Amino acid sequence: MVIQKEKKSCGQVVEEWKEFVWNPRTHQFMGRTGTSWAFILLFYLVFYGFLTAMFTLTMWVMLQTVSDHTPKYQDRLATPGLMIRPKTENLDVIVNVSDTESWDQHVQKLNKFLEPYNDSIQAQKNDVCRPGRYYEQPDNGVLNYPKRACQFNRTQLGNCSGIGDSTHYGYSTGQPCVFIKMNRVINFYAGANQSMNVTCAGKRDEDAENLGNFVMFPANGNIDLMYFPYYGKKFHVNYTQPLVAVKFLNVTPNVEVNVECRINAANIATDDERDKFAGRVAFKLRINKT
């Protein structure tokens, strides 16, 4: 014989919940007395307090082994990469000469990018250094902070400086300037060279034919040793990365040209197939004319 369980009314259910939350007969709150709740809270307070103290101690010990200025571990790849400006999606520099909007965004990006290179700002923040030698600033047992940086003036970029330039870095005339910069690598030395230099060329034979002539600023694409070594963002507060500007004079219009630029120095390898940006950068250039 099946015994049916008596169905409780809504009022009975409410009364049971009220008694569970607070039982006036046993003075229990949610099934526990005040003493029981006090012991539970004390346990979790001690438990989580111990975990917090242990985490804080391990973090403090770890931070004692880490320098505020130089990373303890660095990338296995010691060769700096190259990148271009203006920064574009997929490294495609496309210019429609007759369409101002197509190149005005490039001009605005370059204006902002080159602003810290203004001669007045460089003279205020950085030093005039002796060219052809590394600008080393050892600590010698005492923290030498902040490190000084050498001036790289905007006027060194010649016809690509954008100073008094009505052609907007050449974009309005179909002779655009593309800027090459090296990524920063702490304590990087290029070798015994007097300088490094950037070279550019078409990736394939047909690209070389369509690329035409170009000029580089500073002359020959030189990057002087005085801008090295780099000591890190916190040490080198006002460090200014050296640039090389490439002005393309007569690119074949309406044709996509693949360009590759490389940095040449004794300690820079540009043939590492694992990293396509190690010491080099490839980009596409297209000048559309109607």
Swiss-Prot record:
Keyword field: Cell adhesion, Cell membrane, Disulfide bond, Glycoprotein, Ion transport, Membrane, Potassium, Potassium transport, Signal-anchor, Sodium, Sodium transport, Sodium/potassium transport, Transmembrane, Transmembrane helix, Transport
Transmembrane residue ranges: 40-67
Glycosylation sites: N96, N118, N153, N159, N193, N197, N238
UniProt cross-references to Pfam families, sorted A to Z: Na_K-ATPase
Disulfide bonds: C129-C150, C160-C177, C200-C261
Cellular component terms per the entry's GO annotation: apical plasma membrane; astrocyte end-foot; astrocyte projection; cell body membrane; cell periphery; cell projection membrane; cytoplasm; external side of plasma membrane
GO biological process: cell communication by electrical coupling involved in cardiac conduction; cell-substrate adhesion; intracellular potassium ion homeostasis; intracellular sodium ion homeostasis; lateral ventricle development; membrane repolarization; motor behavior; negative regulation of glial cell migration
Residue intervals annotated with topology Extracellular: 68-290
A molecular-function term among this protein's GO annotations: protein-macromolecule adaptor activity
Subcellular location as annotated: Cell membrane
Cytoplasmic side stretches: 1-39
Transmembrane keyword on record: yes
Function summary: This is the non-catalytic component of the active enzyme, which catalyzes the hydrolysis of ATP coupled with the exchange of Na(+) and K(+) ions across the plasma membrane. The exact function of the beta-2 subunit is not known. Mediates cell adhesion of neurons and astrocytes, and promotes neurite outgrowth.
Family: Belongs to the X(+)/potassium ATPases subunit beta family.
Protein name from the UniProt record: Sodium/potassium-transporting ATPase subunit beta-2
